[in-house]
């Protein structure tokens, strides 16, 4: 099981260079398992025991397995994650021609570690909107090949480089795509038109707009002397998306189960398809009776917010509280913050720990050092919108928000096992 899950994760990461592609990958796997699409613009008539999914903006998805009995009896089991990761996004008018090189201007998306983006073989993917035969349409594209790079400045020209330096995103992050003659002018949208023709065999009249991200072309891989680790891009938080999907597909219970994977978590979640938007609430309102029954059902429900945790780094162990240093390959982490940066409370943490113990899955705890600030997740946002009890958990990771992150190769199986047990659980606290 562990090897198959790790292989599947690596394939999922490769197919998901952007939130749009991650959502498409999730859709493909859900449809293969018999899930049917619900269009938000249509009237819904879901069947008891039916399996459905809803997408919004092509970058967020909610999968629903309706139970054979009313969710009012035993509530809804929900797992939440997010599809986006920090990256470099292409600007609307990106063409830069400097010193005989074609470069593209980029905007930093989210809280990215910038230094690792230098000297990497980069490709470009995302969504392109165009006009064809008088109609406005959109398609996903992925160049796949390494078409760009951000070369470092040689140490001979920057003698203090190893002492740390502030990276200027405006001046230092535009990737190089090609050499060009002095009088040659490159139209980036024309390049996108060519890519649409190559990838989809369609001829666009004009490219109207796009949402494109650079990404590292190096595939995720099992690494380490004993294969103890998985290294790859976008583990935060496609690792949790994949774990939630595998658990949902494996759960054969009669309970109502939901997997929600939102976009825009890395930039605050405040969007129509983000956790701070109405997508999940609106979806549940259309599936559940209004008023009293809706509120009662949510009060019987529970959300597991799954987002990677900071593993204790052997070179920087003092960055963790001495009693709360999660270790790689030692199981999922219950994340606690008394200032509500995480939504965990004693009841939800106790229930998750109970599930882990019952499944013989190791479990850990994380609390940030008292002299450091704490990040957050979709957990508190979802809890405050729905009033649903929530526990924040995640798998330990190194190099979070780097272009290449690291997790334990045993932990995915641990998380899938306990999330499957959660979906199958007959009673919630």
Curated annotation (Swiss-Prot):
Superkingdom field: Bacteria
Required cofactor(s): Zn(2+)
GO cellular component: cytoplasm
Gene3D superfamilies listed in its UniProt record: Aminopeptidase i, Domain 2, Zn peptidases
Keywords from the named record: Aminopeptidase, Hydrolase, Metal-binding, Metalloprotease, Protease, Zinc
Residues reported in the UniProt entry to bind Zn(2+): 82, 156, 401
Presence of keyword Ligase: no
EC primary class: hydrolase
GO molecular function: aminopeptidase activity; metallopeptidase activity; zinc ion binding
One of the GO BP terms on file: proteolysis
EC number: 3.4.11.-
Classification via InterPro entries: M18_aminopeptidase_2, Peptidase_M18, Peptidase_M18_dom2
Family statement drawn from the similarity comment of this UniProt entry: Belongs to the peptidase M18 family.
Name the UniProt record assigns to this protein: Probable M18 family aminopeptidase 2
Lineage per the UniProt record: Bacteria, Pseudomonadati, Pseudomonadota, Gammaproteobacteria, Pseudomonadales
């Amino acid at each position: 099981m562990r090897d198959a899950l790790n292989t599947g994760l690596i394939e999922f990461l490769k197919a998901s260079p952007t939130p749009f592609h991650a959502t498409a990958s999730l859709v493909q796997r859900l449809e293969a398992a018999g899930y049917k699409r619900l269009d938000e613009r249509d009237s819904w008539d879901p069947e008891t025991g039916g399996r459905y999914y809803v997408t919004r903006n092509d970058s967020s998805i909610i999968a629903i397995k309706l139970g054979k009995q009313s969710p009012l009896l035993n509530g809804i089991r929900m797992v939440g994650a997010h599809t986006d990761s920090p990256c470099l996004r292409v600007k609307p008018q990106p063409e830069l021609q400097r010193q005989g090189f074609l470069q593209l201007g980029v905007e930093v998306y989210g809280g990215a570690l910038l230094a690792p983006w230098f000297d990497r073989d980069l490709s470009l993917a995302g969504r392109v909107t165009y006009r064809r035969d008088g109609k406005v349409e959109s398609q996903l594209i992925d160049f796949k090949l390494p078409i760009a790079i951000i070369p470092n400045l040689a140490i001979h020209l920057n003698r203090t480089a190893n002492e740390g330096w502030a990276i200027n995103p405006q001046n230092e992050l535009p990737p190089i795509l090609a050499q060009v003659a002095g009088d040659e002018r490159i139209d980036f949208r024309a390049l996108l038109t060519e890519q649409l023709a190559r990838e989809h065999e369609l001829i666009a009249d004009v490219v109207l707009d796009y949402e494109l991200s650079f990404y590292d072309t190096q595939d995720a891989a099992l690494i380490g002397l004993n294969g103890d680790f998985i290294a790859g891009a976008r583990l935060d938080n496609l690792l949790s998306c994949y774990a939630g999907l595998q658990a949902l597909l494996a759960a054969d219970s009669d309970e109502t189960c939901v997997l929600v994977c939102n976009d825009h978590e890395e930039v605050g979640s405040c969007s129509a398809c983000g956790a701070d938007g109405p997508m999940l609430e609106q979806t549940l309102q259309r599936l559940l009776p209004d008023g009293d029954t809706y509120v009662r059902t949510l009060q019987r429900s529970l959300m597991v917010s799954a987002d990677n945790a900071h593993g204790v780094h052997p070179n920087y162990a003092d960055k963790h509280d001495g009693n709360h240093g999660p270790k790689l390959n030692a199981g999922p982490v219950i994340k606690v913050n008394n200032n509500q940066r995480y939504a965990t409370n004693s009841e939800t943490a106790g229930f998750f720990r109970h599930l882990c113990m019952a499944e013989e899955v190791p479990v850990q705890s994380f609390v940030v050092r008292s002299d450091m600030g704490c990040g957050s997740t979709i957990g508190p946002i979802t809890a405050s919108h729905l009033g649903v009890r929530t526990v924040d958990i995640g798998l330990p990771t190194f190099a979070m928000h780097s272009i290449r992150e690291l997790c334990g190769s045993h932990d995915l199986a641990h998380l899938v096992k306990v999330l499957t047990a959660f979906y199958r659980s007959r009673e919630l606290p």
